[in-house]
Curated annotation (Swiss-Prot):
Originating organism: Escherichia coli O157:H7
Domain Histidine kinase: 256-472
Chain's gene name: qseE
The protein's enzyme class: transferase
GO molecular function, one term: protein kinase activator activity
Official protein name in the record: Sensor histidine kinase QseE
Organism classification: Bacteria, Pseudomonadati, Pseudomonadota, Gammaproteobacteria, Enterobacterales
Topology within the bilayer: Multi-pass membrane protein
Annotated SMART domains: HATPase_c, HisKA
Function: Member of the two-component regulatory system QseF/QseE involved in the regulation of virulence and metabolism in EHEC. Required for pedestal formation in host epithelial cells during infection. Autophosphorylates in response to epinephrine, sulfate or phosphate and then probably transfers its phosphate group to QseF.
Length: 475
């Protein structure tokens, strides 16, 4: 990941910056929404206020027009000068309201028509206790124009409401698109900052996985990202170097220990053989028994040293190259190698290979099968059964080694693959177990990208399962 000049140096700074930048579009959207809401609120208040004023003025003008006509007719009937003054006062008041209402009317012709009719009604003209014919016509024209004014005012008020609704809808659509854009911007920033944080974490995870697989990290690992994660990466590098050093010291110690034990052991074996051959003189039956015990113990010690060396060598070996391995020849070889002890215990072996091949290293797989089958023979019940079977499950091949006998206690199952662990059920035979066989077998299987574990099979006492990658020829 490329480091920017302004890249946050710490994880806290990066997280705070991420929160701020992600919240920024939302804050901008909230601020604009607040501004727009205020503007729409003010506009709605203005529309309501002007609408109320215009509607009341229109109603007042209608009432004034009716009062003018009533005063006009009363004057013609009573010929009272006071009524003439009232009429002129009403006419003046209507004229003032008409001037104020002129900006509301959508058409200036309507205003001019009302103004002309109002001017024509300036003089009172009566005939036979009523307006003369011309005056009556002017009053009727004025009333008709006033009605048109009221209708025009209503149209204007309605158009204002529609305009406000359109603006609200346009603002809503605008904020909808803006919300979508800002959401996408926030999403991009979330993904960007997630990558900035997860990237170094993934690198650390890969380093830990390599450590768990027993591979060295080397000194070529580069770190980027916040200082806390870089510090963790450096500590993991230090841990890798420390583990490599400890591993080398362990291998060296085991080599030296095995070498130092071999020399006195060889002398012990040679002396025991000389005593057993009675080279130094005849032995009594009691002495022969002691010599036999010494010989058996020295052989057990020699086997333990050889297993230690084998375990050490396989731990230090590099990654193996997997190849297509036919299972039938390996199984046949393993069964034949242990046919005598199996026959001595009158044990029967069944072979059922539904999966005929897998990806493995032939010698390592044979070593594992030999160990598991040997355990089945020596730990199994006399006159019991052993079953070697294989099956295909997706891209994996299962190889089961099953025997009848005493089941492994539940409390020991998590420990049987640990080096030097020996369970409560002891091995039957001339050679005592060392506790390294299953540990070596599991390490070998893991080096072949597989797994070895104990499973519970219905009707079976003990079942060890090998899981390996399947080959293209597996059926």
């Amino acid at each position: 990941m490329k480091r920017w000049p302004v890249f946050p140096r710490s994880l806290r700074q990066l997280v705070m910056l991420a929160f701020l930048l992600i919240l920024l579009p939302l804050l901008v959207l909230a601020w604009q929404a607040w501004q727009s809401l205020n503007a729409l609120s003010d506009q709605a208040a203005l529309v309501n206020r002007t609408t109320l004023i215009d509607a009341r003025r229109s109603e007042a003008m209608t009432n004034a027009a009716l009062e003018m006509e009533r005063s006009y007719r009363q004057y013609c009937v009573l010929d009272d000068p006071t009524l003439a003054k009232v009429y002129q006062s009403q006419r003046k008041r209507y004229s003032e309201m008409l001037d104020a209402h002129a900006g509301v009317l959508p058409d200036d012709k309507l205003y001019q028509a009302l103004r002309q009719d109002l001017n024509n009604l300036a003089q009172l003209q009566c005939n036979n206790s009523g307006p003369d014919a011309a005056a009556a016509a002017r009053l009727e024209a004025f009333a008709s124009a006033n009605t048109e004014m009221v209708q025009a005012t209503r149209t204007v008020v309605f158009s204002r409401g529609q305009q406000l609704q359109r603006e609200i809808a346009e603002r809503g659509q605008y904020f909808g698109w803006q919300s979508l854009v800002l959401f996408l911007v926030s999403l991009v920033m979330v993904l960007l900052f997630t990558r900035m944080i997860i990237g170094p974490v993934k690198n650390i995870e890969r380093m830990i996985n390599r450590l768990g697989e027993g591979r060295s990290l080397g000194n070529s690992v580069s770190f980027s990202g916040p200082s806390e994660l870089r510090s963790v990466g450096q500590r993991i590098l230090w841990l890798s170097e420390r583990l490599s050093w400890l591993e080398s010291q362990r291998h060296q110690f085991l080599r030296h220990l095995s070498h130092e034990l071999k020399t006195p052991l060889a002398s012990m074996r040679e002396g025991t053989e000389l005593l057993a051959d009675q080279v130094v003189g005849p032995l009594t039956p009691e002495q022969k028994e002691v010599v036999s015990i010494l010989d058996s113990s020295s052989r057990n010690l020699q086997k333990l040293i050889e297993q230690l060396l084998d375990y050490n060598r396989k731990q230090a070996d590099s990654a193996v190259e997997l190849d297509n391995v036919e299972l039938a020849p390996l199984v046949e070889t393993v069964v034949s190698a242990h046919s005598l002890p199996a026959r001595a215990k009158m044990m029967h072996t069944d072979v059922d290979l539904k999966a005929t091949a897998c990806l493995a290293e032939p010698m390592l797989l044979m070593s594992v099968l030999d160990n598991l089958y040997s355990n089945a023979v020596h730990y199994g019940a006399e006159s019991g059964n052993i079953c070697l079977r294989s099956s295909l499950h997706g891209a994996r091949v299962y190889i089961d080694v099953i025997n009848t006998g005493t089941p492994i206690p539940q409390e020991e199952r998590a420990m049987i693959f640990e080096p030097f662990f020996q369970g409560s059920h002891q091995r039957k035979g001339a050679v005592k177990g060392s506790g390294l066989g299953l540990s070596i077998a599991r390490d070998c299987i893991r080096r072949m990208q597989g797994e070895l574990y104990l499973v519970d099979e219905s009707g079976q006492d003990v079942c060890f399962r090998i899981e390996l990658p399947s080959s293209k020829n597996t059926k």
